[in-house]
Swiss-Prot record:
Cited InterPro entries: Beta-thymosin, Beta-thymosin_sf
UniProt-recorded name of the protein: Thymosin beta
Keyword Hydrolase recorded: no
One Gene Ontology biological process: actin filament organization
Modified residue annotations for N-acetylserine: 2
Organism: Aplysia californica (California sea hare)
Gene Ontology molecular function: actin monomer binding
Cellular component aspect of the GO annotation: cytoplasm; cytoskeleton
Primary location class: cytoplasm
Location(s) in or outside the cell: Cytoplasm, Cytoskeleton
Family label: Belongs to the thymosin beta family.
Location of region: Disordered: 1-44
Keywords, sorted A to Z: Acetylation, Actin-binding, Cytoplasm, Cytoskeleton
Gene3D superfamilies per record: Single helix bin
């Protein structure tokens, strides 16, 4: 059971991790996202 849930979970987490990591990094560096940041994230 653990193995079955671990496989799909990792795949989904990895996909979300990329988006979350980018947003978290930008948020930590810039408390207020600028228009350029939003545009870059939208294009991402």
């Amino acid at each position: 059971m653990s193995d079955k849930h671990d496989k799909p979970d990792i795949s989904e987490v990895t996909k979300f991790d990329k988006s979350k990591l980018k947003k978290t990094e930008t948020h930590e560096k810039n408390p207020l996202p600028t228009k350029e940041t939003i545009d870059q994230e939208k294009q991402g």
